Regions:
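Conserved small/polar residues in nucleotide/adenosyl-binding loops
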Residues: 152-159
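Solvent-exposed loop/turn segments at secondary-structure junctions
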Residues: 5-9, 43-50, 108-112, 136-140
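Loop/turn elements at helix/coil->beta-strand transitions in domains of secreted/extracellular proteins
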Residues: 33-38, 66-67, 99-102, 126-130
Length: 159
């Protein structure tokens, strides 16, 4: 499976349900083939929405991981405490592949949410069962939030 970006849909405006439904449909088809291994191509995937990565990882993870922590977002001391834990989604169990082995193809463009999929599956599948093939990834297994850091003003016609 080639995965180019973790995006919910056109302009990412309220397509979360559509995205999840499409993923469940696709993985129902995969599950009917009873795979014990899966090849995931993340070569040109710069990341995107963590919730999309969470959905994909929930479909690939061992069934025993469902409902357990996928990742925890930890904020620094300057930011109001907003630490959040995202769990593997247990409602995906009917489509979950319960894989024994995952092969992930990477490149120097693989980043962020893509790296989260790799790193967050390893504790549940084991390092030997999440096999990374390809180039070293960006090394940005973190997320970002935007904040306005300066006041925007218009020039005034003062003398």
């Amino acid at each position: 499976m080639v995965y180019n970006k973790f995006s919910t849909g056109p302009l990412d405006n309220g397509y979360e349900t559509d995205y999840a439904q499409q993923m469940l449909q696709i993985f129902s088809e995969f599950k009917s083939e009873a795979p014990d291994a899966f090849i995931l191509d993340l070569r040109y995937n710069p990341g995107g929405y963590l919730t999309c990565a969470q959905e994909l990882a929930s479909l690939l993870a061992p069934e025993s991981a469902l409902g357990k922590p996928f990742c925890t977002m930890q904020y620094n001391d300057i930011t109001t405490p907003q630490d959040t834990t995202y769990n593997f989604i247990s409602t995906t169990s009917a489509q979950n592949l319960n894989l024994n082995k995952l092969y992930v193809i990477t490149s120097t463009f693989t980043a962020s949410a893509s790296e989260a999929v790799i790193n967050c599956l390893r504790p549940y599948m084991g390092d030997d069962n999440v096999v990374v093939i390809g180039e070293t990834t960006v090394g940005k297994p973190v997320a970002m939030s935007g904040y306005t850091c300066l006041l925007y003003t218009s020039p005034s016609p003062r003398d």
